[in-house]
């Protein structure tokens, strides 16, 4: 990193302010021996805004496969031939049971995730009824249900959903390489509608899709402008049968650099590390020192995660206090 970048990192750490796009790009070029300096800054920013608080979340694949969209990475797209399960919306009792099971873990959020561009009114009303009738003070309801309009989002909010997840996936300049069945503007409109109805915004994407480093910074800068509440970072897991099946996965240190860059550009947003984390191997524990405030645990959508007991043991080894999980 340039001397000016180190200076800018230290200033950002002291003030808790976002770094410039120029500094962010330099973060992605940090040499291995510069990673400790980068982690010092990212950890300082995390602690300034979040203390030692960490947040674990889990999700339920509540409707799978047969998606009309052609996202290049996705095993659930009907445009791809994969081994992903295909099933309709789960019964409300199944969703409620999964929520109650999650409440027995130290997770603070439980997300209901459905495939497809958007759920029907009937399905949304069914999920809203489940949320309305199932609650636990330990776990907040989240939803990820595609491109919904304000009226549908409002219905979910009134039922008890507190946060809506809708990824932009990548930089706007790279999105046409990833999806052709809908545009970036539609996704961005949904993100803004979520904010307008008063739900918290969970919005991030997948890194390692083939985007340039400049586009990775472009993406982080957009999330900063949108002032999202939480940024879930996924790392591409190439799935056989998808258009990106042959793309090599990111290297662990590149993942660390990217987490730190998103943290330094979005100092007040939660940064959660989700799918692809297992590919970091022995470096998984480093994510918190790169600025992450949480991670997704348990089953994912179409790729394997790590067993929850291993993740909880990792947090114990890091000596995060039990009170840190909220």
Swiss-Prot record:
Record has Chaperone as a keyword: no
Protein name per Swiss-Prot or TrEMBL: Biotin synthase
Cofactor: [4Fe-4S] cluster; [2Fe-2S] cluster
A Pfam match: Radical_SAM
Alphabetical list of InterPro entries matching this protein: Aldolase_TIM, BATS_dom, Biotin_synth/BioAB, Biotin_synthase, Elp3/MiaA/NifB-like_rSAM, rSAM
UniProt pathway annotation: Cofactor biosynthesis; biotin biosynthesis; biotin from 7,8-diaminononanoate: step 2/2
GO biological process, one term: biotin biosynthetic process
Substrates-to-products reaction catalysed: (4R,5S)-dethiobiotin + (sulfur carrier)-SH + 2 reduced [2Fe-2S]-[ferredoxin] + 2 S-adenosyl-L-methionine = (sulfur carrier)-H + biotin + 2 5'-deoxyadenosine + 2 L-methionine + 2 oxidized [2Fe-2S]-[ferredoxin]
Subunit and interaction comment: Homodimer.
Alphabetical list of SUPFAM superfamilies matching this protein: Radical SAM enzymes
Species in which this protein is naturally found: Syntrophobacter fumaroxidans (strain DSM 10017 / MPOB)
